[in-house]
């Protein structure tokens, strides 16, 4: 049997999204189904969210006033009206299937129905830039832990524990892997291609990151340099700190890429450096929207003392010029008074002598 798929299923009821790495130049479609039992409060709550690449495009919530599959991307307005009726019915049917799954899991794990439990699945497909299929996946989780997953070959299953082996035997006998493989390799790909065409202005764009480095003193001897990348799409990006040209991967604190709230993404990477050695560190930013990688360093702010010196020098220069003008005017004034005549300005000069008087001490 193949290895279990990564533990990426999260409780989407809280709106969390774990971004799944994809190959550069590829596209993906993913669906997340979550059913949460709530004893004494009626039917389990059932939620579906669908993503094309990093953009949510559909959502269903059984707790809505009128539960329907809903549009979450503007370009989904291009689909025919019956699409929403069909997807709503599929969602309602799946909600009932998941209700049964929750009850079955209670028996398999010998648990009481008094507590709340969660059953989830994530499935989807990925295609190359030219639309060719290259990867599919389907995995299930119970109470936040792996339950069973379709292997990489899309022909067999891996169960996480003895309880899940009951499901594995049942699905192997029913040929469930073959059914899912057919969907992932064909129907999933066809829909993904269609969505990519409808939303190409959004989904196939490449917004470059706005990047900069900030400086945060940690102590008298150390400081933290943080490299920021903001406003980029798609989500795939690389931030690498280097010291004298050598990667500092082991010493870098790197946060997960996260949504920026406006359809773009943000990320940062930080490294602690000795004070005074900041200029030896550079941040390298690579993203599909950049014509070439960015190389950034921390730019120290202008020193206040240097600014003050510059201002003082400028003021002194102005005073020297004014002093020279005053001296010239005084000499001309004294020269005119000595001859006992009146000073008459040359033709074309200033006719208002008041400006000269204002310069006198």
Curated annotation (Swiss-Prot):
Residue ranges of the region described as Connecting peptide: 299-308
Domain annotation Ig-like C1-type: ranges: 209-297
Keywords: Disulfide bond, Glycoprotein, Immunity, Membrane, MHC I, Phosphoprotein, Signal, Transmembrane, Transmembrane helix
GO cellular component term of the entry, any: extracellular space
Record's subcellular location: Membrane
Subunit structure: Heterodimer of an alpha chain and a beta chain (beta-2-microglobulin).
Protein name: RLA class I histocompatibility antigen, alpha chain 11/11
